[in-house]
């Protein structure tokens, strides 16, 4: 199971930028990989394990922030198309079970 986190956070003031950067660092600390500036993903061996992370992500959303979270199965993730420039690239493979721990 993959979890995709997409967000739009206010960054007009210095304190808003600090909170937005803190949210990005929180995602990285939780094991998410950055796909784009405001798009992160994480692989879960067990879909039930997402609950704890969902709660942490919810309580960390800065005021005025908009966050959308999508869960995708391995087959849904494998069906995505990825480009780097005009070149089509392979998508990320799920990590080996031992790599997750």
What are these model-predicted stretches?
Residues 1-4, 9-101:
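Basic nucleic-acid-binding interfaces
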